[in-house]
Amino acid sequence: MANQTGATRIMEKTNTASESVDVLIVGAGISGIGMAVHLRDKCPGKSFAIVERRDEIGGTWNLFQYPGIRSDSDMHTLGFKFEPWTEQKAIADGPSIMNYLHRIKAKHDLEKHIRFDHKVLSASWSSEEARWTVTAEKSDGSRVEMHANFVYMGAGYYDYDSPYDAQIEGLGNSKGEVVHPQF
């Protein structure tokens, strides 16, 4: 099968959809969104796609919505040079960061590049073909193979399938409410 950069096609012998791009970005959180904008700016002729496990951008800032969630870094540091943080509070809450990311996504027309509900199952490099093959599972259970010359991992460091449940001595004796950001 010939490499058809940017084209989606059905592979002849399987029921797996396939897509080829120059760069595949894994994760549509702050890192993935930032990489997409930099890629468009620095390499405008390169095709790219973003695979996002969830049905929304934002990563941490979308997943964790407990009361009082905020950045522990100022947004002048955490934000992007190409889209300076202009809000009054430098230590931003989660909803403000989500608004910032949505504004960037809209301004740079990134929506059409994002493949929502795609959980990456594997990534393998072929030296013979000089490209990556990434297999992802969609929310309906179907699978898609994506081929790319480069893969950028911006998926963060949380294990969404098995969040860490710290066993803290005496926690059960607490009279206050115990909150875990992933439970």
Where are these regions (language model features)?
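Basic/polar N-terminal segments that are highly enriched at the extreme N-terminus
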Residues: 1-19
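Glycine-rich dinucleotide-binding loop and its adjacent helix/turn
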Residues: 6, 10, 79-88, 93, ...
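Active-site acidic short loop of glycosyltransferases
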Residues: 18-21, 147-149, 176
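N-terminal Rossmann-like FAD-binding beta1-loop-alpha1 element of flavoenzymes
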Residues: 20-50
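Short amphipathic alpha-helical segments
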Residues: 37-38, 62-63, 163-167
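Glycine-rich FAD pyrophosphate-binding loop
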Residues: 40-66
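Glycine-rich phosphate-binding loop and adjoining beta1-alpha1-beta2 segment
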Residues: 58, 62-79, 88-96
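Feature captures the FAD/FMN-dependent oxidoreductase FAD-binding
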Residues: 88-160
